[in-house]
Swiss-Prot record:
Motif ('KMSKS' region): 193-197
InterPro entries: aa-tRNA-synth_I_CS (IPR001412), aa-tRNA-synth_Ic (IPR002305), Rossmann-like_a/b/a_fold (IPR014729), Trp-tRNA-ligase (IPR002306), Trp-tRNA-ligase_bac-type (IPR024109), Trp-tRNA_synthetase (IPR050203)
Annotated residues for binding of L-tryptophan: 133
Protein name in UniProt: Tryptophan--tRNA ligase
Main enzyme class: ligase
Domain of life: Bacteria
Similarity field: Belongs to the class-I aminoacyl-tRNA synthetase family.
Length: 329
């Protein structure tokens, strides 16, 4: 069975877009792959974090994974910082990465421009750590969005470089992009991706938003003025985005939804979608609360840590042997 790896930062509550574009799709592939789902808290500290808030968000994200349908008997759910092999392998890959290729990363350049107080080295070395997250589990498939595509290209280059310079130790991962309709955009600016870090609260729906507040956000979402419910990302980005949300939460095809609302106005469509979103959040948050407040959550994370440590140790030892680190035993 092939291995799939994905990591999410505990830097805020995931949005309904993260659920439709990632979490929901993870649930669907649990039977097809050996899945490792990682809460990447060491990536989160590349920007300043309040320690108590970070700890809370780590637990919240774990509960959100489980509420989404991740089954700990099928998948490995764990916290990055509890598996030392991540940073150990990350340092090894950092030694074969060049400053130039790290500085060319678009995310580094964007974030560096916003840091008037100096650029942390961790922002620059983020990609080799991300590469290590992936390769230490002999990952075959990595589901990523467009924003991580450049990092994945670097990961594949680092794998080639390591295998060429040392031994053919690392598995070269393949990138899997989200399915069509799986990308959810901002509610007020549907030309950009929905983001949990957006300054405008009306642009996104958090998975822990009050359901009635989320319903209002749907009703006030930007659309065009022609009143035709049709998926056309280029010419009708607003209504296309709402169709993606409707389809993602109901599992109904966009084509069927278009037929259902043929001749109907946006008011009827938005009203129905707002109820769908509200009902989804009520159900989701009930599951979330049951996991967040349960001792079972810690048992699940402990089990995941042990499994991840065992799996990553094997690859780490191969990397160390290939590079000549430590003593021969």
């Amino acid at each position: 069975m092939e291995t799939l790896f994905s990591g999410i930062q505990p830097s805020g509550i995931p949005t309904i877009g993260n659920y439709i574009g990632a979490l929901k799709q993870f649930v669907d592939v649990q039977d097809d792959y050996e899945c490792f789902f990682c809460i990447v808290d060491q990536h989160a500290i590349t920007v300043p974090q309040d320690r108590l808030k970070l700890r809370k968000q780590i637990r919240q994200l774990a509960a959100i994974y489980l509420a989404s349908g991740i089954d700990p008997d099928k998948s490995t759910l764990f916290i990055q910082s509890e598996v030392p092999a991540h940073v150990q392998a990350g340092w090894m890959l950092t030694t074969i990465a060049s400053i130039g290729e790290l500085e060319r990363m678009t995310q580094f350049k964007d974030k560096a421009q916003k840091r008037a107080d100096g650029v942390p080295a961790g922002l620059l070395t983020y990609p080799p750590l991300m590469a290590a997250d992936i390769v230490i589990y002999n990952t075959n498939i990595v589901p990523v969005g467009d924003d991580q595509k450049q990092h994945m290209e670097l990961t594949r280059n680092l794998v080639d470089r390591f295998n060429s310079r040392y031994n053919d130790v690392l598995v070269k991962p393949e990138v899997r992009m989200p399915k069509v309709g799986g990308r959810v955009m901002s509610l007020q600016d549907p030309t950009k991706k929905m983001s949990k870090s957006d300054d405008n609260q009306k642009n996104f729906i958090s998975l822990l938003d009050e359901p009635h507040v989320a319903a209002k956000k749907i009703k006030s979402a930007v659309t065009d003025s022609d009143g035709i419910i049709k998926f056309d990302r280029e010419n009708k980005p607003g209504i296309s985005n709402l169709l993606s949300i409707y389809s993602g939460l109901t599992n109904d095809s966009i084509k069927n939804i278009e037929s259902k609302y043929e001749g109907e106005g946006y008011g009827k469509f938005k009203g129905d979608l707002s109820e769908i979103v509200k009902d989804f959040l009520i159900n989701f948050q009930e599951k979330y609360a049951s996991f967040y407040n349960s001792d079972d959550l810690d048992d699940i994370l402990d089990k995941g840590k042990e499994k991840a440590q065992k799996a990553s140790f094997k690859t780490l030892k191969k990397m160390e042997k290939a590079m000549g680190l430590g003593r021969k035993r």
